[in-house]
Amino acid sequence: MNVLDNSVIIKGSKNGITVFLDEEMPFEELLENVSDKFKNASKFFNNATMAISFDGRNLSAEEEKRILNVISDVSELNIVCVLDENNDIKSVYEEAVKKAMNSFNISHQPERQKITDPKTTCMFYKGTLRSGQVFEADGSVVVLGDVNPGGKVVAKGSVIVLGSLKGNIFAGVDGNENAFVVALEMSPMQIKIGDIIARSSDSGVNKISKGKNKSKILEPKIAYVYDQNIYVEDLEQNALDDISLD
Protein backbone atom coordinates (compact mmCIF):
# COMPACT_ATOMS: atom_id res chain seq x y z
CA MET A 1 0.00 0.00 0.00
CA ASN A 2 1.32 3.42 -0.93
CA VAL A 3 2.47 5.37 2.13
CA LEU A 4 0.39 8.33 0.95
CA ASP A 5 -2.73 6.20 0.61
CA ASN A 6 -5.53 7.41 2.85
CA SER A 7 -8.12 4.77 2.01
CA VAL A 8 -7.74 3.32 5.52
CA ILE A 9 -7.11 5.62 8.49
CA ILE A 10 -6.90 4.39 12.08
CA LYS A 11 -7.62 6.86 14.86
CA GLY A 12 -7.66 6.24 18.58
CA SER A 13 -10.59 7.22 20.78
CA LYS A 14 -11.42 7.07 24.49
CA ASN A 15 -12.96 3.63 24.05
CA GLY A 16 -10.78 2.03 21.38
CA ILE A 17 -10.14 2.78 17.72
CA THR A 18 -12.13 4.13 14.79
CA VAL A 19 -11.25 2.95 11.29
CA PHE A 20 -12.11 5.41 8.53
CA LEU A 21 -12.68 3.63 5.22
CA ASP A 22 -12.73 5.03 1.69
CA GLU A 23 -16.30 5.09 0.42
CA GLU A 24 -15.61 4.53 -3.28
CA MET A 25 -12.68 2.09 -3.44
CA PRO A 26 -13.60 -1.46 -4.58
CA PHE A 27 -14.04 -3.60 -1.49
CA GLU A 28 -11.42 -6.23 -2.36
CA GLU A 29 -8.79 -3.54 -2.84
CA LEU A 30 -9.88 -1.84 0.36
CA LEU A 31 -9.58 -5.15 2.22
CA GLU A 32 -5.96 -5.47 1.10
CA ASN A 33 -5.26 -1.96 2.36
CA VAL A 34 -6.86 -2.80 5.71
CA SER A 35 -4.57 -5.82 5.94
CA ASP A 36 -1.48 -3.76 5.16
CA LYS A 37 -2.44 -0.97 7.55
CA PHE A 38 -3.02 -3.26 10.54
CA LYS A 39 -0.01 -5.42 9.72
CA ASN A 40 2.20 -2.34 9.83
CA ALA A 41 0.58 -1.24 13.10
CA SER A 42 0.68 -4.68 14.77
CA LYS A 43 3.63 -3.80 17.04
CA PHE A 44 1.83 -0.67 18.17
CA PHE A 45 -1.32 -2.56 19.16
CA ASN A 46 0.58 -5.51 20.64
CA ASN A 47 -2.02 -7.53 22.62
CA ALA A 48 -4.32 -4.58 23.32
CA THR A 49 -7.99 -5.25 24.08
CA MET A 50 -10.38 -2.61 22.77
CA ALA A 51 -13.56 -1.81 20.91
CA ILE A 52 -13.59 -0.88 17.23
CA SER A 53 -15.89 1.24 15.08
CA PHE A 54 -16.02 1.94 11.35
CA ASP A 55 -16.72 5.27 9.66
CA GLY A 56 -16.86 6.71 6.16
CA ARG A 57 -18.40 3.70 4.44
CA ASN A 58 -21.56 1.64 4.86
CA LEU A 59 -20.55 -1.98 5.35
CA SER A 60 -22.70 -5.05 4.96
CA ALA A 61 -22.58 -7.65 7.73
CA GLU A 62 -20.45 -9.89 5.51
CA GLU A 63 -18.00 -7.08 4.65
CA GLU A 64 -17.64 -6.15 8.32
CA LYS A 65 -16.99 -9.78 9.20
CA ARG A 66 -14.30 -10.09 6.53
CA ILE A 67 -12.57 -6.92 7.73
CA LEU A 68 -12.60 -8.15 11.34
CA ASN A 69 -11.17 -11.51 10.26
CA VAL A 70 -8.36 -9.78 8.37
CA ILE A 71 -7.52 -7.60 11.38
CA SER A 72 -7.48 -10.69 13.59
CA ASP A 73 -5.20 -12.55 11.15
CA VAL A 74 -2.54 -9.85 10.77
CA SER A 75 -2.44 -8.33 14.28
CA GLU A 76 -2.60 -9.29 17.95
CA LEU A 77 -5.43 -6.83 18.56
CA ASN A 78 -8.25 -8.26 20.69
CA ILE A 79 -11.54 -6.76 19.53
CA VAL A 80 -14.13 -6.90 22.31
CA CYS A 81 -17.01 -5.43 20.30
CA VAL A 82 -17.94 -3.35 17.27
CA LEU A 83 -19.54 -0.03 18.12
CA ASP A 84 -21.66 2.31 16.05
CA GLU A 85 -23.30 5.65 16.66
CA ASN A 86 -26.55 4.02 17.79
CA ASN A 87 -24.95 1.41 20.02
CA ASP A 88 -26.31 1.54 23.59
CA ILE A 89 -23.20 -0.23 24.91
CA LYS A 90 -21.07 2.60 23.55
CA SER A 91 -23.00 5.16 25.60
CA VAL A 92 -22.78 3.03 28.72
CA TYR A 93 -19.07 2.43 28.21
CA GLU A 94 -18.30 6.11 27.59
CA GLU A 95 -20.30 7.22 30.61
CA ALA A 96 -18.66 4.66 32.89
CA VAL A 97 -15.16 5.64 31.79
CA LYS A 98 -15.96 9.36 32.06
CA LYS A 99 -17.30 9.01 35.59
CA ALA A 100 -14.40 6.82 36.62
CA MET A 101 -11.77 9.23 35.39
CA ASN A 102 -13.38 12.09 37.34
CA SER A 103 -14.20 10.10 40.45
CA PHE A 104 -12.36 10.20 43.73
CA ASN A 105 -13.39 6.58 44.16
CA ILE A 106 -10.92 5.22 41.59
CA SER A 107 -8.84 2.65 43.47
CA HIS A 108 -5.50 0.99 42.85
CA GLN A 109 -5.38 -1.08 46.05
CA PRO A 110 -3.40 -4.32 45.61
CA GLU A 111 -4.53 -5.67 48.98
CA ARG A 112 -7.94 -6.58 50.40
CA GLN A 113 -10.14 -3.49 50.59
CA LYS A 114 -13.55 -2.92 52.12
CA ILE A 115 -15.71 0.10 51.31
CA THR A 116 -17.99 0.78 54.27
CA ASP A 117 -19.65 4.11 53.36
CA PRO A 118 -23.39 3.25 53.28
CA LYS A 119 -24.04 6.18 50.95
CA THR A 120 -21.86 4.65 48.24
CA THR A 121 -23.99 3.26 45.43
CA CYS A 122 -21.26 2.46 42.94
CA MET A 123 -17.49 2.14 43.22
CA PHE A 124 -14.89 2.09 40.46
CA TYR A 125 -11.75 -0.01 40.45
CA LYS A 126 -9.16 0.94 37.83
CA GLY A 127 -6.63 -1.77 37.05
CA THR A 128 -6.31 -5.54 36.98
CA LEU A 129 -7.33 -7.69 39.94
CA ARG A 130 -4.73 -10.44 40.08
CA SER A 131 -4.68 -13.76 41.92
CA GLY A 132 -5.15 -13.27 45.65
CA GLN A 133 -6.48 -9.71 45.34
CA VAL A 134 -9.99 -8.93 46.59
CA PHE A 135 -12.10 -5.80 46.11
CA GLU A 136 -15.19 -5.41 48.32
CA ALA A 137 -17.95 -2.79 48.20
CA ASP A 138 -21.25 -2.09 49.94
CA GLY A 139 -22.79 -1.06 46.62
CA SER A 140 -22.19 -1.98 42.99
CA VAL A 141 -18.76 -2.13 41.34
CA VAL A 142 -17.38 -1.18 37.91
CA VAL A 143 -13.96 -2.69 37.19
CA LEU A 144 -12.01 -0.76 34.57
CA GLY A 145 -9.75 -3.67 33.73
CA ASP A 146 -9.56 -7.45 34.04
CA VAL A 147 -10.31 -9.86 36.86
CA ASN A 148 -7.67 -12.57 36.52
CA PRO A 149 -8.00 -16.17 37.78
CA GLY A 150 -7.81 -16.06 41.57
CA GLY A 151 -8.91 -12.41 41.70
CA LYS A 152 -12.21 -11.65 43.41
CA VAL A 153 -14.87 -8.94 43.55
CA VAL A 154 -17.40 -9.00 46.41
CA ALA A 155 -20.31 -6.54 46.17
CA LYS A 156 -23.73 -6.07 47.72
CA GLY A 157 -24.91 -4.75 44.36
CA SER A 158 -24.11 -5.64 40.75
CA VAL A 159 -20.68 -5.98 39.13
CA ILE A 160 -19.63 -4.70 35.70
CA VAL A 161 -16.22 -5.70 34.34
CA LEU A 162 -15.02 -3.59 31.40
CA GLY A 163 -12.47 -6.22 30.49
CA SER A 164 -11.96 -9.97 30.87
CA LEU A 165 -13.63 -11.78 33.76
CA LYS A 166 -11.67 -14.93 34.55
CA GLY A 167 -11.77 -14.83 38.35
CA ASN A 168 -14.51 -14.90 40.98
CA ILE A 169 -17.48 -12.56 41.34
CA PHE A 170 -19.81 -12.50 44.34
CA ALA A 171 -22.68 -10.08 43.63
CA GLY A 172 -25.70 -9.38 45.82
CA VAL A 173 -23.85 -10.80 48.83
CA ASP A 174 -26.61 -9.70 51.21
CA GLY A 175 -29.01 -12.07 49.43
CA ASN A 176 -30.00 -9.72 46.59
CA GLU A 177 -30.79 -12.03 43.68
CA ASN A 178 -31.74 -9.04 41.51
CA ALA A 179 -28.04 -8.20 41.21
CA PHE A 180 -26.32 -9.05 37.93
CA VAL A 181 -22.84 -9.41 36.44
CA VAL A 182 -21.71 -7.94 33.10
CA ALA A 183 -18.34 -8.52 31.42
CA LEU A 184 -16.86 -7.80 28.03
CA GLU A 185 -15.35 -11.30 28.18
CA MET A 186 -17.23 -13.74 30.40
CA SER A 187 -15.00 -16.69 31.39
CA PRO A 188 -15.24 -16.75 35.20
CA MET A 189 -14.02 -19.39 37.61
CA GLN A 190 -17.12 -18.79 39.72
CA ILE A 191 -20.07 -16.42 39.90
CA LYS A 192 -22.32 -16.14 42.94
CA ILE A 193 -25.41 -13.94 42.85
CA GLY A 194 -27.31 -13.83 46.12
CA ASP A 195 -27.20 -17.44 47.31
CA ILE A 196 -26.99 -18.95 43.81
CA ILE A 197 -23.61 -20.26 42.64
CA ALA A 198 -22.39 -21.20 39.15
CA ARG A 199 -18.91 -22.47 38.34
CA SER A 200 -17.08 -22.78 35.04
CA SER A 201 -17.27 -26.58 35.37
CA ASP A 202 -21.07 -26.62 35.73
CA SER A 203 -23.02 -28.39 33.01
CA GLY A 204 -26.29 -27.27 31.47
CA VAL A 205 -27.05 -24.60 28.90
CA ASN A 206 -28.15 -22.13 31.56
CA LYS A 207 -24.95 -22.41 33.59
CA ILE A 208 -21.61 -20.76 32.94
CA SER A 209 -19.31 -22.70 30.66
CA LYS A 210 -15.97 -21.79 29.16
CA GLY A 211 -16.42 -21.37 25.44
CA LYS A 212 -14.16 -23.15 23.00
CA ASN A 213 -14.37 -20.34 20.46
CA LYS A 214 -10.90 -18.82 20.24
CA SER A 215 -12.01 -15.88 18.12
CA LYS A 216 -10.57 -12.56 19.23
CA ILE A 217 -13.94 -10.90 18.64
CA LEU A 218 -15.46 -11.05 22.10
CA GLU A 219 -19.13 -10.66 22.94
CA PRO A 220 -20.21 -8.76 26.08
CA LYS A 221 -22.42 -10.95 28.27
CA ILE A 222 -24.67 -10.60 31.28
CA ALA A 223 -25.25 -13.13 34.08
CA TYR A 224 -28.40 -13.00 36.18
CA VAL A 225 -30.63 -15.18 38.36
CA TYR A 226 -33.86 -16.64 37.07
CA ASP A 227 -35.82 -19.49 38.64
CA GLN A 228 -32.97 -20.23 41.08
CA ASN A 229 -30.39 -20.63 38.31
CA ILE A 230 -27.74 -18.32 36.91
CA TYR A 231 -28.18 -17.64 33.21
CA VAL A 232 -25.60 -16.06 30.89
CA GLU A 233 -26.76 -14.27 27.75
CA ASP A 234 -25.38 -11.86 25.18
CA LEU A 235 -25.70 -8.29 26.39
CA GLU A 236 -28.65 -7.20 24.27
CA GLN A 237 -31.68 -5.03 24.92
CA ASN A 238 -34.03 -7.97 25.52
CA ALA A 239 -31.73 -9.28 28.25
CA LEU A 240 -31.56 -5.83 29.87
CA ASP A 241 -35.36 -5.57 29.82
CA ASP A 242 -35.57 -8.65 32.05
CA ILE A 243 -33.34 -7.14 34.75
CA SER A 244 -35.00 -5.85 37.92
CA LEU A 245 -33.29 -3.11 39.93
CA ASP A 246 -35.58 -3.43 42.95
Swiss-Prot record:
The keyword Lipid biosynthesis does not apply. Keywords: Cell cycle, Cell division, Septation. GO terms for biological process: cell morphogenesis; division septum assembly; regulation of cell septum assembly. Interacts with MinD and FtsZ. Pfam families: MinC_C, MinC_N_1. It comes from the Bacteria. Belongs to the MinC family. Cell division inhibitor that blocks the formation of polar Z ring septums. Rapidly oscillates between the poles of the cell to destabilize FtsZ filaments that have formed before they mature into polar Z rings. Prevents FtsZ polymerization. HAMAP family: MinC. InterPro entries: CAP/MinC_C (IPR016098), MinC (IPR013033), MinC_C_sf (IPR036145), MinC_N_1 (IPR055219), Septum_form_inhib_MinC_C (IPR005526). This is Probable septum site-determining protein MinC.
